[in-house]
Amino acid sequence: MVYAIVRAGGRQEKVSVGDFVTLNRVAGGAGSTIELPALLLVDGDKITTAAADLAKVTVTAEILQDLRGPKIVIQKFKNKTGYKKRQGHRQELTKVKITGIK
């Protein structure tokens, strides 16, 4: 089994060919192809971690759609002063399909 650890959207993800992965927003529209930098490559019993060897490895992915994560609510409250603050946030995400590890 071939899989790679890639850096994508400020995080590290374990991916193999055919996987669907949700990342922090990546530039590009639906249908475009992106390359992700590999940090580790496992091909059966062979493990590659050397930077010189990983520079030759390309992990390609196809952008499927841009979406938004669930809404989270942030609240601040200070007792006895009447101070209240409420804020919401939805993270911008991109869903990709891993198309190749070479």
Swiss-Prot record:
GO terms for cellular component: cytoplasm; ribonucleoprotein complex; ribosome. Keywords: Ribonucleoprotein, Ribosomal protein, RNA-binding, rRNA-binding. One of its GO terms (biological process) is translation. InterPro entries: bL21-like, bL21-like_sf, Ribosomal_bL21, Ribosomal_bL21_CS. SUPFAM superfamilies: L21p-like (SSF141091). Disulfide bonds: none annotated. It comes from the Bacteria. Transmembrane segments: none annotated. GO terms for molecular function: rRNA binding; structural constituent of ribosome. Part of the 50S ribosomal subunit. Contacts protein L20. NCBIfam families: L21 (TIGR00061). This protein binds to 23S rRNA in the presence of protein L20. Belongs to the bacterial ribosomal protein bL21 family. This is Large ribosomal subunit protein bL21. It comes from Pseudarthrobacter chlorophenolicus (strain ATCC 700700 / DSM 12829 / CIP 107037 / JCM 12360 / KCTC 9906 / NCIMB 13794 / A6). The lineage of its organism: Bacteria, Bacillati, Actinomycetota, Actinomycetes, Micrococcales. The gene is rplU.
